C-alpha cells in the first residue's frame, strides 16, 4: 500500500501486458494498482478523463492519448473522495456533499443526509442524480444547463 504521494505517476503508468475482453474490443490493462480503484470512468482517445486521489482529496484531469494511456495529469480541484464525473462540462465531485464545478468554481452543492459514496447521472433527460451513500440511495433532480455562464 502506497502513501499516495506518487498518484500522478501512477496515473501515467504504462503496463507491459493487457488482456482483450470477451467483446473483442475492450482492452484491460494489467495494472498493478487497479485493485485500489473503486470508481472507473469512461473516456475516449483525445478526450479528458478525471480521477480522484482519495488520500490527498484532490481531482486530477488527464488526457487520454491515441494509445489509451493517461497523459498530462494535473490537479484541478483540491477536494474529492471516491467519485468524479464530467457531465455537460460540469465537474461533479463527491466528498462530504456533491459539489458541482464549472470553470474551476463551485456553482452548486447537493447535500444528502449521509456521506455519498458514488453517484451518476441518469433519467430520460439526463437530469437525475442517483447517489449511493452509507445508509441508502438518494435521488436528486439537477439542471446542469442553468450553470452555464
Summary of predicted features, one role per range:
Residues 118-149:
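Blade-level signature of beta-propeller repeat domains, shared across WD40, Kelch, NHL, RCC1
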Residues 21-28, 66-74, 105-108, 146-149:
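Beta-strand initiation motifs
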Residues 41-62, 66-73:
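Glycine- and Gly-Pro-enriched alpha-helical subdomains that act as flexible
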Residues 1-4, 12-18, 29-48, 74-95, ...:
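Beta-rich, blade/repeat-based domains predominating
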Residues 16-20, 58-60, 97-99, 136:
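A short loop-to-beta-strand structural motif that recurs across blades of beta-propeller domains
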Residues 9-10, 14-17, 146-149:
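Predominantly five- to eight-bladed beta-propeller fold
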Residues 1-5, 54, 64, 95-96, ...:
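Short loop/turn segments immediately following the C-termini of beta-strands
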Residues 20-23, 53, 63, 101-102, ...:
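Structural recognition of the beta-propeller blade-terminating site
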Amino acid at each position: 500500500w502506497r502513501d499516495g504521494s506518487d498518484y500522478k505517476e501512477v496515473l501515467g503508468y504504462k503496463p507491459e501486458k493487457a488482456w482483450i475482453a470477451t467483446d473483442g474490443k475492450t482492452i484491460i490493462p494489467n495494472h498493478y494498482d487497479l485493485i485500489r480503484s473503486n470508481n472507473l470512468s469512461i473516456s475516449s482517445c483525445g478526450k479528458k478523463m478525471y480521477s480522484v486521489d482519495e488520500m490527498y482529496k484532490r481531482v486530477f484531469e488527464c488526457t487520454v492519448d491515441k494509445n489509451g494511456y493517461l497523459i498530462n495529469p494535473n490537479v484541478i480541484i483540491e477536494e474529492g473522495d471516491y467519485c468524479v464525473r464530467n457531465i455537460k462540462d460540469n465537474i461533479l465531485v463527491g466528498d462530504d456533499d456533491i459539489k458541482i464545478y464549472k470553470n474551476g468554481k463551485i456553482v452548486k452543492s447537493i447535500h444528502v443526509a449521509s456521506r455519498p459514496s458514488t453517484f451518476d447521472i441518469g433519467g430520460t433527460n439526463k437530469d437525475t442524480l442517483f447517489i449511493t451513500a452509507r445508509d441508502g440511495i438518494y435521488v436528486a433532480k439537477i439542471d446542469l444547463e442553468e450553470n452555464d455562464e
